[in-house]
Amino acid sequence: MPNEHMKINNVVAILMSVRDEESYIDLNISYHLDLGFDYIFIANHCSTDKTNEIMDSYKDDSRVIVIEEKDPIFNHAKIANKLLNYANINYKIDWFIFLDADEFLSIKDETVKNFTARLEKNDIPYATIGWANALFDHTLSDYTCSPVHAIDTTKYYYPWPEKTWQEYGHFRKAIVKNHKNIEIVVGGHYVKTENNPKFFGEYNRDPFIVPKNEAKLLHFEFRNKADAVYKKWEKLASFENDSTSDTNSPWLERIRTIKKYVEDFKDNIDEINKRWFLEHRTFWGATIPEDRIVYDSTLSLWYRKYFRRKIESGKIKSVCLVRSGNLGDVIMTEPVARFLSKYVDQIYLATKIEWAESIFNTYNKVYRYNQVNSGEIDCDIMIKLVYELSDNQKTYIQGYMESIGFGEMAVKDIPILNSEWKNTINGEYILIAPLTSWWEEKKRNWGYKKFVELSKLLETEYNTTCVMLEKHYSFSEMMSLIRHCKLFVGNDAGPAIIVQSFSKRAFIIFGATHPKYIHMSRYTVPVYNRNIHKLCKHRTRKEELDCCEEFCMERITVGEVFNQIRLHV
């Protein structure tokens, strides 16, 4: 049965003032239109960067209304009220929310219309939504917040009062039903309830506090890099003026601190990186405790839709795909790159895997992973390939497709790799790959001794040599051994992914991972315990991995693997 609040069809609008927000404004507008906002009213306040160009791209969209603000002094409340008056004179708006370009509304409801309808149904005309401030790690060591674009994080923290004059209300913003004599105050955070006390009723003095599990404002206070936040501070130090506050108001300490930061960190961007992008500190410098950390994947999931729209628009000419490792995961990016090459002229890859450039012919260039935030990668758009957020019914490659917004497009291609590898061994041989990467190693590795025992059986059975793929082999030697082997046997690891590209008969032994995650070539035979999850109803890969014990692979005997090989060779 549909919810009753679905019957209420409010007209909901954003009021926003921007100045030089080229990194965020297009993302912000696009996201909130997708969330169901009817209008976004924007005061373009003396922007000199690409903000103007981005605004112009929305000139034919009747939902985005841009007003040019020429006064260089940044008086937030004055500009917001000017915008508010324009909206009310020319449009009929039921609800307003006041946002900056670096604030994104994350709600439990499917649309903002459903959200405001719920407020209305519960007689809440005035509510506040709290910030969750974004965290980034530019060392790229924390995958939850290692950014490749401006909103690329799932890690946030809830701010708290650090100064005696601060209240929790400083970290919240209002969403309010339109009413007579509406007036914005407190730097654009709230409205003046004294203008219409009867309208607000029980919320005349204190607006309803929306629980954080229902809604939050994902706030990119520090942007996504040090030089960007320094430029933001410079502009605020030069132009901000709060006309709704007395000159001795204690909260003006913030703007004084910003002016001090502009002096302190001039020509010292590295210290900003250290303090706010490595150590995770608040604006005031306090280290953020673990109990204030929260994770939210709203924007990460939405960015997929944004990425696809940009790709299909035809305006994107170059894409950089980012996947740090492991080897097999990076190999499986190739079909995705091939798919995207139908839309763009140039495809790049950024990865930690050395020698990756020698593997692929699909990529125009391969960059080092540590170049991701260096400004050295010249591309129109960048995106991480992440299968980890998809359910356990999809292959890794299909998970990658989902992460770029094309999840419904089935890709069953085997990666195409460079096959020109010089043969270094005379005669036929069986390649045994007994190693895995460190990730879930004990649950994925069948065991070195078992591989040795199996190799002896195979040498006798087929009167041939077995070569063990040991760590001492170089990357090119490994590729050569895989390319020219007669038969391959190994764990579910990088070499097992590579061998399929060369159409070799391969036997892959699975433990905590599952054959269904790999779209295998017709020459590949999976060997695994089919009964391991007989009672389970896992929905995620992590559940499946956690369910396995380290001893699970011991159930697969040497005899079983040997018999499977004899059956298929």
Q: Where does each model-flagged region fall?
A:
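N-proximal low-complexity "stem/linker" segments adjacent to membrane-targeting elements
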Residues: 1-30, 313
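A conserved acidic beta->alpha catalytic loop
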Residues: 44-54, 71-73
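Catalytic-site signature of metal-activated, phosphate-bearing donor transferases
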Residues: 78-84, 107-308
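Short beta-strand-to-loop acidic/aromatic patch adjacent to the donor-nucleotide binding site
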Residues: 92-106
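Active-site and donor-binding regions of nucleotide-sugar-utilizing enzymes
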Residues: 309-397, 477, 496, 501
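Donor-binding and catalytic core of enzymes assembling or modifying cell-surface/extracellular glycoconjugates
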Residues: 331, 444-516
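Mid-sequence helix-capping/hinge segment at a functional interface
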Residues: 384-448, 480
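Nucleotide-sugar donor-binding patch of glycosyltransferase catalytic domains
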Residues: 500-569
